[in-house]
Amino acid sequence: MKLKTLAKATLALGLLTTGVITSEGQAVQAKEKQERVQHLYDIKDLHRYYSSESFEFSNISGKVENYNGSNVVRFNQENQNHQLFLLGKDKEKYKEGIEGKDVFVVKELIDPNGRLSTVGGVTKKNNKSSETNTHLFVNKVYGGNLDASIDSFSINKEEVSLKELDFKIRQHLVKNYGLYKGTTKYGKITINLKDGEKQEIDLGDKLQFERMGDVLNSKDINKIEVTLKQI
């Protein structure tokens, strides 16, 4: 994400790395120190975020509006007003708006007007009967010891956002492997595709805003590998 775009996104969302509303002065400071914006989440912030509730909405439509220089789509679902930020590839893909799409929502914050802000997570309207079971290999490295496990990870849609994969994999790791408890914060997720390409996610940081709009075909995923490191 470019420096200018990142600063605007930070100001528009009203948060830095802790998920709390900040002043414009703090947003300016974030612009000057770009590298800190996605790297200051401490272990409690990450645990809180990846333990939080998520929502999966279907058939969502809305026009793109400009909000402090960022593209947003506003919609109402389950008596809650939502504000969807398009900050990555989805910004170019949905220049005018979205129509009949699925949206995976995780709360970034509630603004003073009561709108729930979320980022990315837009995919095509999926066939609910589609389900892919993928091997999830988890390697826990503690000092010189290695503990390896193999789980089954279910994806119930054909097209899935990187945001949803990241969130659900980390939530699984939080619940079953103690991620973000004690000193277990570091490591990575590697999503291996059948064509040899891969997506890597650093467990020491929250997924970057601009990557939350990336999408994958679940049928193209070969396996998912996780390395957990304790320091």
Curated annotation (Swiss-Prot):
Family: Belongs to the staphylococcal/streptococcal toxin family.
InterPro entries documented for this protein: Enterotoxin, SSL_OB, Staph/Strept_toxin_CS, Staph_exotoxin, SuperAg_toxin_C, Superantigen_bac, Toxin_b-grasp_Staph/Strep
Self-association state and partner proteins as the record states: Interacts with host IgA and complement C5; these interactions inhibits complement activation.
PROSITE patterns attached to this UniProt entry: STAPH_STREP_TOXIN_2
Pfam assignment, any one: Stap_Strp_tox_C
Keywords: Secreted, Signal, Virulence
Effect the entry attributes to changing N68Y: Loss of host IgA binding
Signal peptide: 1-30
Biological role: Plays a role in the inhibition of host complement-mediated lysis and serum bactericidal activity by interacting with complement component C5. Affects all three pathways of complement activation and inhibits the cleavage of C5 by preventing its binding to C5 convertases. In turn, prevents C5a-mediated neutrophil migration.
Assigned GO CC terms: extracellular region
Subcellular location: Secreted
Protein's gene: ssl7
Main location: secreted
Record keyword Secreted present: yes
Name of the protein described by the UniProt record: Staphylococcal superantigen-like 7
Organism whose genome encodes this protein: Staphylococcus aureus (strain NCTC 8325 / PS 47)
SUPFAM superfamilies: Bacterial enterotoxins, Superantigen toxins, C-terminal domain
